[in-house]
């Protein structure tokens, strides 16, 4: 039975994180920025699971941390979308550049 090396998991996680970081820094649509942040969190989850499974003492700690991170990411997405809906009702736009003032 062949096993996937740890470097493959880490390379995939780095690629996912870089794609998410690039999207979060360059895109102007707030929904896309939230999706890119979720992609970065998933890359971190992949690292947690890979190190847990392929480490010196394999155990379930990485999987448990990954599940906890997914719960936090779901809450973050819900709060982010709620804020986005409130801003859209107030400003009628979801562009990041348009949201530069606090009131008015």
Swiss-Prot record:
Q: Any stretches that span the bilayer, and where are they?
A: 4-24, 31-51, 67-87
Pfam families tied to this protein? Oxidored_q2 (PF00420)
**GO annotation, biological process:** ATP synthesis coupled electron transport
Gene Ontology molecular function, alphabetical: NADH:ubiquinone reductase (non-electrogenic) activity; quinone binding
Write the Enzyme Commission number(s) for this entry: 7.1.1.-
| Protein origin, superkingdom | Bacteria
Q: What is its main location?
A: membrane
**Family classification:** Belongs to the complex I subunit 4L family.
* The protein's assembly and partners: NDH-1 is composed of 14 different subunits. Subunits NuoA, H, J, K, L, M, N constitute the membrane sector of the complex.
Relate the protein's function as given in its record. Answer: NDH-1 shuttles electrons from NADH, via FMN and iron-sulfur (Fe-S) centers, to quinones in the respiratory chain. The immediate electron acceptor for the enzyme in this species is believed to be a menaquinone. Couples the redox reaction to proton translocation (for every two electrons transferred, four hydrogen ions are translocated across the cytoplasmic membrane), and thus conserves the redox energy in a proton gradient.
The protein here is known as NADH-quinone oxidoreductase subunit K
């Amino acid at each position: 039975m062949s096993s996937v090396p740890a470097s493959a998991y880490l390379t995939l996680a780095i690629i996912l994180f870089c794609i998410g970081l690039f999207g979060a820094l360059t895109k102007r649509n707030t929904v896309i920025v939230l999706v890119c942040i979720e992609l970065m969190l998933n890359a971190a989850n992949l690292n947690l699971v890979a190190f847990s499974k392929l480490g010196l003492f394999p155990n379930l700690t990485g999987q448990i941390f990954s599940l906890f991170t997914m719960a936090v990411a779901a809450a973050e997405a819900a709060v982010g979308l709620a804020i986005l809906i409130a801003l859209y009702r107030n400003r009628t736009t979801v562009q990041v550049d348009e949201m530069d003032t606090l009131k008015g």
